[in-house]
Regions:
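Short acidic, glycine-rich surface-loop motifs adjacent to enzyme active sites
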Residues: 3-4, 103-125
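Extended low-complexity, serine/threonine- and proline-enriched intrinsically disordered segments
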Residues: 250-277
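Extended active-site neighborhood of metal-dependent phosphoesterases/phosphodiesterases
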Residues: 11-106, 129-148, 156-204, 210
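Active-site glycine-centered loops adjacent to acidic/histidine catalytic or metal-binding residues
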Residues: 4-5, 33-34, 117, 151-153
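Binuclear metal-dependent phosphoesterase catalytic core
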Residues: 164-257, 297-304
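Aromatic sugar-binding surface patches on proteins
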Residues: 271-303
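Short, well-ordered beta-to-alpha junction loops that form the rim of enzyme active sites
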Residues: 75, 115-120, 153-154, 215-216
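N-terminal active-site segment of His-dependent metallophosphoesterases
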Residues: 1-15
Length: 304
């Protein structure tokens, strides 16, 4: 599943993208991103998706695979007021209508995987309730057995399972936001600006059981975090950047040689490796280091 921004504003390279995905030798499901739109047309947004539709098909479609109903949907809304890249997130009225009609044919005991470019539910920094038609599309998904909301767009990795204190009208929801597979924007080297390495999520669906792990390019699946010693974190903490950390994990412990050393606590931090990488970059059009929520830390009372 490709979560959007496949061409980065270059409408003529759709054939190149198709050639490269064909080499992967597997079925590819595409989602349209803001950089896949024709941003030059000022007439109406439907014309902005014309090139995408010519090469990759509809911007909204669905498929049943096993016990899961997959939805691929366009949630990038351009205002078309001027030639600037001005858009918001959410669903047009006609898109909500399509979603409701699509779900009429899906049994309520199905698992739903809804894939969009921008996160439709739990975001890291903004209120998704401001998304156009948020209440309507939330209600449409409310009664299904479980909903997984997949997205890209925000250039960080972020997983969140709904909790009562952050009520988004759906309590059977996990949101997964995926960073760029190629690394930080316009840099395309090793790391993203939250410290997540180049890579992608591998999702295993066994009936109704859904699990996943992050697969870093050039590594095996056991490489799931980077641990930084106190010398890299200011001298007081051991800190771990865990790419696929989820709030539903509960307590995370630090063990060495079969002995529990300490309890890890959630901590927003800059990734030390990306900070070092960014310091060497002369083209500062890439992303600056960002505070990432997937970090955990534990204090120390001995020399490391």
């Amino acid at each position: 599943i490709e979560l959007g921004d496949v061409i980065y504003n270059e409408l003529t390279v759709y054939p190149v993208y198709l050639h490269n995905t064909d080499r992967v030798n597997m079925v590819t499901f595409n989602v349209i991103g803001n950089h896949d739109h024709d941003q030059t047309t000022l007439l109406k947004d439907s014309l902005g998706t014309m090139h995408y539709e010519m090469h990759l098909g509809p911007t909204c479609y669905s498929a049943n695979i096993g016990r899961v109903h997959y939805i691929f949907i366009d949630d990038i809304l351009y205002d078309r007021k001027d030639a600037k890249e001005s858009y918001r997130h959410g669903l047009y009225d006609e898109t909500v209508h399509w979603l409701i009609e699509d779900l009429k044919y899906v049994p309520k005991d199905k698992i739903i995987m809804i894939c969009a470019h921008a996160q439709m539910f739990n975001k890291k920094t903004t209120m998704v309730r401001r998304n156009k038609n948020f209440a309507a599309y939330s209600k449409a998904l409310l009664d299904f057995k479980y909903v997984y909301s997949w997205a890209g767009h925000n250039h960080h990795t972020y997983l969140y399972t709904s909790e009562p204190e952050r009520n988004y009208d759906i309590d059977n929801l996990t949101s997964i936001t995926v960073t760029k597979s190629t690394g930080a924007l316009r840099l395309n080297r090793l790391l993203n600006n939250d410290g997540t390495p180049q890579g992608y999520f591998v999702v295993d669906v066994d009936g109704e059981e859904v699990s996943w792990y992050y697969l870093c390019c050039g590594k095996d699946r056991n490489y799931q975090m980077k641990v930084y010693p106190p010398a890299r974190t200011g001298g007081e903490y051991v800190m771990a950047n865990i790419w696929a950390h989820d709030n539903k994990w509960g307590a995370v412990e630090w063990w060495e040689n079969g002995v529990k050393v300490g309890q890890m606590e959630a901590h927003d931090a800059l990734d030390p490796d990306y900070v070092d990488l960014y310091a060497t970059v002369t083209n500062k059009t890439t992303r600056i280091p960002m505070l990432a929520e997937e970090f955990l830390r534990a204090g120390i009372d001995f020399d490391f």
